[in-house]
């Protein structure tokens, strides 16, 4: 029977589809398991990154079904976004057509891989049946006070013609087109995420996310406990309110810095000699994102605004500056500058020759050290100039200052957040229309729920070089009637950020066919109880998507739509799939694979290769479709899952996938052998079945903890090796073979389901594995440990004999014809047994070991005393950097020694097999002292470590 993956895979994919085996509904009698991967943007063909992500998810979904779980495993498409719009411009088409063509392509790829999705629940965010509920939820949030339209400085990308959220600006450049981003004031729609800032932060302690993801979210939310302090402007009624987390440094303030966009700046410099310099700075800051101004600035610039502010606790007048490192959206947009205790302020003060004053000391009772840098740690207050402050430290110092400010009405303790409200609106076509209408009489009016969805028009023309939002000029879309007063009005032409679409899709999947509501509460609460049980996706979504999804879940809970507080119970961030690409070390740049045989086009140096993430831009991609055609989907899945643990990066290798294909053929051969086995008896029955029970327990443990690589190692490599070993050792009976296969084939199913189904059917099973529940509790038989330990002992002896032969052959002119094995003397076995028992009883060998040894009869024999002491040391202490054997022997070894295992009898019984395995004529076995001490091996023989010599 030949292994024919194409035929097998087509057969079972059709069978699964016809039987609708992966469709799932609420079933309170079963434990549920909701498995979900971050759904793809349908750019066309599936790539290896997709294959890895979905192979992980599919394996876990199939594993949980085998274990009796009611599994929800859906698929959809994150199908709104600029790429489809840009593609439509290139071909003069419509984003809708581009998107649906791509969806059909990737759907075919997914089905060819055999992924076990409930296809009834398939959704696309660009389908009006989905984005209708985007709009409905938006109106619900509006009713809850979570939606706000206001003018605000925004990140504007000119080439894309749209606003970007802070999270979408990378190094002051658009995450999509990489062009420079500018700050611009516009009327925009916001979701008030800050309402949930505390809950979003505090709940991180209770969810199973990778620690680096939690750290990124904590940093992004950025809760700061501090105080707002009022600095009156000299000669004016205006006051600068500055937020600080270090009120203990207030006596060191030597200047105040405003964000260039702070509204007070204009009034302070207008018509003065400082206006031109200020406007130059403000224009420069407008070309930078807030993120870069906070985190990436190297050159801190400022402009004196010609005015002074008064320190509320000292009365000192300090100059007011505008600085590029202060942003309006954090705190109050104003900073009290303390150069003695903040390095950023220190650098600024040095540059502009502003006084530096130290008011904290590292050492109690001493003056501050002069180090040429700011001391930013906590310290003892000094030089305050006021009573009751000097000598205070840390939190006591902070609280004393806050109390003084509040008592004098000059400040108030408060909490600030780095997290900002979600700027949602985009000036693009291919997104969810924001369901509002602009009426001259009524203002901004929500679209009535019964009029949803507000649909995107299909008659928009897209052309190369087109800019702006086509909705704004589409009269059929824009012109409408006000639902309140009935006069002519205009629709909102902004669309929603596409991250909105993916912020609740996991809830829609729980009830995807519902046309009356976004989802039914009963369905959502069942499938989302505790959150999505396993969510798989890239680390790049740690802040944006994952944070938005957490916000949505909490807001929808408060809207009464569900009882869930967190969307995801466990998050796995899968590693990248990498492949070799040309690399120039001098330029530190990766180049397209077409340049592999050329010098670097920039510097002319010879190129080397290094591993890089597969990407179209580098040309180092591998087509899953071609690999499936050549090797089959099961082989591709095996390569992906065995290549690395889910969280680790992995390298593509042609030789590795070819090796995995050979392994699949070896598995097929072994399975066929087992099915066709009709032997009445077998020497290895007990061992093979004991081994299968042990392997099944280990496999279940690994798979349950998403240890897919180690799980696949057991199911696809060790189980084959065990079968082959059993055949070499004397074979197994038909009954044992059948039992082994019924244990083994389901273990193959999660990773390589097609071959597993085929062999399960060939075995005579009438129920598909897709509909089968197996017992995951594989209880060992009483003698399993001893049986396995004996066989492992035999393997070790053979391996050691091979190693000794290599050494012996170097010192022998002729051919080696026999191997002599001397097992340990009886007294060594007895003493080892006692040492194991004492260790299990927590005996203190350091205190009482020698005293015990002196009571033993072997110790009192002068001829053996020295050898006994040496052996005892090896067993309980160790030597030559090796720990004592009682610390290195495992459960199997301990059980074997304590069982009274007769090494001589066992090895003698298996001498024939050893002779065959070692390709040697004679194998002699005896206990040390009962025969010739060949090569002096008797003294070095230990329990389970016989002395071995060749001659």
Model-flagged regions — what are they?
Residues 8, 13, 193-223, 259-303, ...:
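Amphipathic alpha-helical
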Residues 1-48, 188, 200-201, 211-224, ...:
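Non-catalytic terminal extensions that flank enzyme cores
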Residues 25-93, 122-137, 244-245, 312-348, ...:
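N-terminal catalytic cores of NTP/NDP-binding nucleotidyl/phosphoryl-transfer enzymes
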Residues 658, 767-951:
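C-terminal low-complexity, glycine/proline- and small-hydrophobic-enriched intrinsically disordered tails
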Residues 2, 11, 15-19, 90-248, ...:
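Residue patterns forming the tRNA-binding/recognition surfaces of aminoacyl-tRNA synthetases
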Residues 307-330, 478-648:
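Alpha-helical recognition segments enriched in aromatics with Gly/Pro capping
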């Amino acid at each position: 029977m030949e292994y024919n993956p194409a035929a097998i895979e087509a057969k079972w994919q059709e069978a699964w589809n016809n039987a609708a085996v992966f469709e799932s509904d609420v079933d309170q009698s079963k434990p549920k398991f909701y498995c979900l991967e971050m759904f793809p943007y349908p750019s066309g063909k599936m790539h290896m990154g997709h294959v890895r992500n979905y192979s992980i998810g599919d394996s876990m979904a199939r594993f949980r079904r085998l274990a009796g779980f009611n599994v929800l495993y859906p698929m959809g498409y994150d199908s709104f976004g600029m790429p489809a719009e840009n593609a439509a411009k290139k071909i003069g088409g419509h984003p809708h057509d581009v998107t649906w063509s791509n969806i059909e392509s990737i759907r075919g790829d997914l089905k060819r891989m055999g992924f076990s999705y409930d296809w009834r629940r398939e959704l696309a965010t660009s389908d009006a049946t989905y984005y209708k509920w985007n709009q409905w939820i938006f109106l619900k949030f509006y009713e809850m006070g979570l939606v706000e339209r206001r003018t605000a400085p925004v990140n504007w990308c000119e080439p894309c013609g749209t606003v970007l959220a802070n999270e979408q600006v990378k190094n002051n450049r658009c995450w999509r087109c990489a062009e420079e981003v500018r700050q611009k004031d516009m009327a925009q729609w916001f979701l008030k995420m800050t309402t949930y800032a505390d809950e979003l932060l505090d709940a991180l302690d209770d969810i199973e996310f990778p620690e680096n993801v939690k750290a990124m979210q904590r940093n992004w939310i950025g809760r700061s406990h501090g105080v707002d302090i009022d600095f009156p402007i000299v000669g004016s009624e205006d006051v600068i309110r500055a937020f600080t987390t270090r009120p203990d440094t207030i006596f060191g303030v030597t200047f105040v810095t405003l964000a260039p966009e702070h509204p007070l700046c204009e009034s302070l410099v207008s018509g003065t000699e400082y206006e031109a310099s200020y406007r130059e700075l403000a224009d420069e800051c407008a070309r930078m994102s807030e993120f870069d101004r906070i985190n990436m600035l190297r050159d801190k610039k400022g402009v004196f605004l010609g005015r002074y502010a008064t320190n509320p606790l000292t009365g000192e007048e300090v100059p007011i500056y505008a600085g590029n490192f202060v942003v309006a959206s954090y705190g109050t947009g104003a900073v009290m500058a303390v150069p003695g205790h903040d390095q950023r302020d220190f650098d600024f003060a040095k540059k502009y020759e502003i006084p530096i004053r130290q008011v904290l000391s590292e050492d109690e009772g001493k003056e501050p050290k002069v180090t040429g840098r700011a001391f930013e740690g906590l310290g003892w207050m000094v030089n305050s100039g006021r009573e009751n402050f000097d000598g205070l430290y840390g939190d006591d110092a902070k609280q004393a200052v806050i109390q003084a400010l509040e008592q004098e009405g000059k400040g108030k303790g408060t909490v600030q957040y780095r997290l900002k409200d979600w700027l949602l609106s985009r000036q693009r076509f291919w997104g969810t229309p924001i369901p509002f209408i602009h009426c001259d009489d009524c203002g901004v009016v929500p679209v009535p729920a019964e009029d949803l969805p507000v649909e995107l028009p299909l008659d928009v023309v897209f052309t190369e070089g087109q800019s702006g939002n086509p909705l704004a000029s589409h009269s059929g879309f824009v012109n409408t009637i006000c639902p309140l007063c009935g006069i002519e009005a205009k629709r909102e032409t902004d669309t929603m950020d596409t991250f909105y679409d993916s912020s609740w899709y996991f809830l829609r999947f729980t009830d995807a066919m519902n046309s009356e509501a976004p989802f039914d509460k009963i369905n959502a609460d069942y499938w989302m109880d505790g959150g999505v049980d396993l969510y798989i996706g890239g680390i790049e979504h740690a802040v944006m998507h994952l944070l938005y999804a957490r916000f949505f879940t909490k807001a929808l809970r408060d809207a009464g739509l569900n009882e869930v507080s967190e969307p995801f119970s466990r998050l796995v961030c899968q590693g990248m799939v990498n492949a070799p690409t040309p690399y120039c070390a001098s330029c530190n740049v990766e180049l397209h694979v077409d340049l592999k045989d050329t010098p670097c086009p920039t510097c002319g140096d010879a190129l080397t290769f290094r591993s890089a993430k597969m990407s179209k831009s580098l040309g180092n991609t591998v087509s899953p479709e071609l690999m499936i055609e050549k090797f089959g989907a099961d082989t591709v899945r095996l390569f992906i899952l065995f290549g690395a643990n889910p969280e680790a990066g992995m390298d593509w290798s042609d030789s590795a996938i070819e090796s995995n294909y050979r392994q699949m053929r070896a598995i097929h051969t072994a399975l066929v052998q087992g099915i066709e086995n009709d032997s009445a008896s077998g020497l290895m029955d007990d061992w093979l079945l004991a081994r299968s029970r042990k392997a099944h327990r280990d496999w279940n443990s690994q798979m349950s903890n998403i240890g897919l690589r180690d799980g696949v190692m057991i199911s696809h490599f060790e189980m084959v090796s065990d079968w082959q070993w059993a055949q070499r050792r004397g074979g197994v009976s038909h009954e044992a073979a059948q039992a082994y296969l019924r244990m083994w084939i389901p273990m193959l199913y999660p990773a390589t389901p097609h071959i597993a189904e085929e062999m399960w059917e060939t075995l005579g099973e009438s129920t598909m594995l897709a509909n089968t529940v197996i017992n995951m509790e594989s209880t060992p038989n009483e003698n399993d440990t001893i049986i396995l330990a004996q066989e492992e002992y035999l393997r070790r002896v053979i391996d050691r004999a091979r190693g000794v032969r290599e050494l012996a052959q170097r010192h022998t002119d002729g051919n080696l014809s026999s191997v002599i094995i001397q097992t340990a003397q009886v007294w060594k076995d007895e003493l080892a047994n006692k040492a194991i028992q004492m260790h299990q009883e927590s005996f203190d060998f350091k205190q009482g070991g020698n005293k015990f040894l002196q009571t033993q009869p072997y110790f009192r024999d002068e001829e053996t005393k020295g050898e006994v002491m040496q052996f005892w040391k090896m067993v309980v202490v160790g030597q030559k950097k090796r720990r004592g054997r009682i610390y290195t022997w495992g459960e199997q070894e301990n059980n074997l020694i304590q069982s009274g295992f007769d090494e001589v009898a066992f090895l003698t019984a298996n001498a024939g097999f050893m002779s065959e395995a070692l390709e040697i004529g004679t194998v002699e076995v005896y206990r040390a002292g009962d025969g010739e001490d060949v090569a002096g091996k008797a003294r070095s023989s230990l329990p389970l470590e016989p002395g071995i010599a060749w001659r």
